[in-house]
Amino acid sequence: MTKNLITINQFIQKSLGEWKSIRSTHSLAFQEVENSTSKIEIKELESNNKNVLGLLEKYNYTSKPSFIALSISWKAISDWEIDQKIEQDKTILLFLPKDKNKGIVLRNKGYTESVISSSEYLIDENENLNIKTIYSSTASEERICFLSNHIRSRYSVIRNNENNTVIQTSHTSEIRNMSILKD
């Protein structure tokens, strides 16, 4: 019996909303640990959004492919920073399915390097979203899974492309902000 896997559209619909996040990052190269907390908001964007159309243009898409567009914004505070100032940013992701469980992700900025980046995604047999991005000197592998409808877990590994050594790992626990769901 074949299991019907969750589709990328279903995974994204489950991810929409506001999340509270706690992340621990281990920099193996510098033997340092960073802990951070953040508020993350994931919104679906319309296909005719000017930023979405601009991103498609940057990737030289002349026709409009089938895609799901997201805006992810965050505000974070880290124990890495001495002054404990709040960092904030946002990114746009376009998921272009090749089939119901795998495809390409286009971003206006990368996860490990602040340049536009293209990734491959796959939803595995455990319904985890796996995203792999190859940059000029590093590769990022990220896995996002739902532990329940309101709890997500993210794991990431950054490797050196030259010798495949692990440079950094991180684990993030995300809890949906339930207060915004109440009337």
UniProtKB/Swiss-Prot annotation:
Q: Quote the InterPro entries the UniProt record gives.
A: Calycin, CpcS/CpeS
What keywords is this UniProt entry annotated with? Lyase
* Matches recorded under Pfam families: CpeS
- Keyword rRNA-binding among record annotations: no
Question: So what EC number does this one have?
Answer: 4.-.-.-
Keyword field contains Cell cycle: no
Where is the signal peptide, in residue numbers?
Answer: none
Recorded GO MF terms: lyase activity
Q: How does it assemble?
A: Homodimer.
Role of this protein: Acts as a chromphore lyase, covalently attaching 3Z-phycoerythrobilin (3Z-PEB) to its target protein CpeB (phycoerythrin). Binds the isomeric chromophores 3E-phycoerythrobilin (3E-PEB), 3Z-PEB as well as their precursor 15,16-dihydrobiliverdin (DHBV) but not other chromophores tested. While it can transfer 3E-PEB a non-physiological adduct is made. Chromophore is bound to the lyase in a ratio of nearly 1:1.
Of which family is this protein a member?
A: Belongs to the CpcS/CpeS biliprotein lyase family.
Would you tell me the protein name for this molecule? Phycoerythrobilin lyase CpeS
Organism, per UniProt?
Prochlorococcus marinus subsp. pastoris (strain CCMP1986 / NIES-2087 / MED4)
Q: What are the leading ranks of the lineage?
A: Bacteria, Bacillati, Cyanobacteriota, Cyanophyceae, Synechococcales
Gene this chain is encoded by: cpeS
